[in-house]
Regions:
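Flexible, small-/acidic-enriched active-site or ligand-binding loops
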Residues: 136-139, 156-157, 182-220
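Short beta-strand micro-motifs in enzyme catalytic cores
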Residues: 148, 166, 177, 200-205
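Short glycine/proline-enriched turns and hinge-like loops at secondary-structure junctions
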Residues: 66-67, 133-136, 159-163
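A short, Trp-centered hydrophobic/proline-enriched beta-strand micro-motif
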Residues: 117-129
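A generic local secondary-structure boundary/capping motif
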Residues: 111-113, 128-130, 138-140, 154-158, ...
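N-terminal glycine-rich flavin-associated loop
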Residues: 83-106
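A short core secondary-structure module
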Residues: 151-188
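Alpha-helical interface subdomain recognition
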Residues: 1-82, 103-104, 114, 118, ...
Length: 385
């Protein structure tokens, strides 16, 4: 599909381009590789001040009330500039807290303000509820006095070590709840490790973590699963938008190099084999762009599906690795050096492609959700679409 931006979206995209040009880029990324958090907290504050974290917070909770399409426009630029802050995850958490406040008054205004200002890092710890039982990482929440006691483990959570709190979907005897778990709560253990691009992820273990529900419960059993699914799909689309930006900038690097690097007395960009490779990479990028924004618009319109989102993440994860590897090959030996920028985009691609599930896992997810959608449509009394 052709993406037609309205005036507000054009301004948002231009603003994001300027922010990333000023605060992002390969040089800024290199400086962060030795930082424990893997990102710049000062830059996160700047991003928050630009309104990215409050984009999807409902207007009833004093947010901007915009959609994932708008956030994707900003995150596409973030991908171009190797901005590693977990914007998609934090913006999704802010939406969850804001939605809870708007619907039931759950949470506190102070907690939401701390989140959208970038002061509080609330990392989602969510999982697709349709994952096969053998791969499922359940977190159980037992009723305990006036709250809950959480037990379970989740692996591969981005920025788990530096989080101030976690947004957890937990299973109770009555259904799924969505609850905030402060990082310093007794019983939480985080085992962190670094990824190839210098950021971090970790395994979180909840061992009889006791919580009072008054201020921490975002959604009870009636809305918990639905809200958790909404947040999960928005994170998938946000990360896919970052991958789109990574691909675009990586290919731009290669095209620029081919126009200046000469062999046999002529630019290597004049060689048909490299032209064909660049065109194939461009086609992959445009396929991801079209699918991404089509699904973003569908989600914002209230008729998106989990199968569609899985298709986006699978396509983007596969394409970003293919394009960035191709870019390395188009550069030749210089592409392998740490001093050259192309390798930074490959490393970023490797991290984003595996976040929240790789291409293979999301293809499986697409099949599961497509089957579930078909079964639901075939139920008696359901009109086939």
């Amino acid at each position: 599909m052709e993406l037609v931006l309205n005036d507000d979206q054009k301004l948002l995209k231009e603003s994001a381009e300027k922010l990333v040009e000023r605060y992002g880029g390969p040089d800024a990324h290199r400086k962060l590789r030795d930082v424990e958090s893997g990102f710049d907290k000062g830059r996160l504050k700047t991003i928050a001040e630009a309104g990215w974290l409050s984009l999807m917070v409902p207007e009833k909770a004093d947010g901007l009330g915009l959609g994932i399409t708008d956030l994707a426009l900003a995150l596409e630029q973030a991908g171009r500039g190797l901005v590693t802050e977990p914007v998609a995850a934090l913006a999704a958490s802010a939406r969850a807290v804001g939605t809870g406040r708007a619907a039931t008054g759950a949470g506190t205004e102070q907690a939401l303000n701390s989140l959208v200002s970038g002061k509080n890092i609330l990392i989602p710890v969510l999982q697709d509820p349709t994952v096969p039982a053998a791969k499922r990482e359940r977190i159980f929440a037992e009723h305990y006095h006036y709250g809950y006691q959480l037990t379970g483990t989740r692996t591969g959570i981005p920025f788990a070590e530096v989080a101030d709190g976690f947004l957890v979907d937990a299973n109770t005897s009555d259904g799924t709840i969505l609850i905030i778990v402060p990082r310093d709560t007794f019983g939480i253990t985080v085992d962190a490790s670094r990824t190839v691009d210098g950021t971090a992820h970790g395994t979180i273990d909840f061992a009889e973590v006791t919580l009072m529900a008054d201020e921490l419960l975002i959604a009870g059993v009636k809305q918990g699963e639905k809200l958790a699914a909404d947040i999960y799909i928005r994170i998938m689309l946000g990360v896919s938008a970052e991958m789109l930006g990574v691909m675009e900038q990586a290919l731009d690097l290669a095209v620029g190099y081919m126009q200046t690097r000469e062999q046999f007395g002529r630019p290597i960009g004049s060689f048909q084999a490299l032209q064909h490779r660049a065109v194939n990479d461009h086609i992959q990028i445009e396929l991801v762009r079209s699918l991404l924004y089509q699904v973003c618009n569908a989600v914002d319109g209230g008729h998106g599906s989990r199968a569609m989102v899985a298709a986006v993440k699978a396509r983007a994860s596969e394409a970003v690795l293919s394009v960035t590897k191709s870019v390395i090959q188009m550069h030749g030996a210089i592409g392998f050096t740490d001093e050259y920028d192309a390798g930074l985009y490959l490393r970023r691609a490797m991290t984003l492609a595996s976040q929240y599930g790789n291409a293979s896992e999301h293809r499986e997810s697409f099949v599961r959700h497509s089957r579930l959608d078909a079964e639901k449509a075939a139920e008696p009394g359901k009109r086939r679409k």
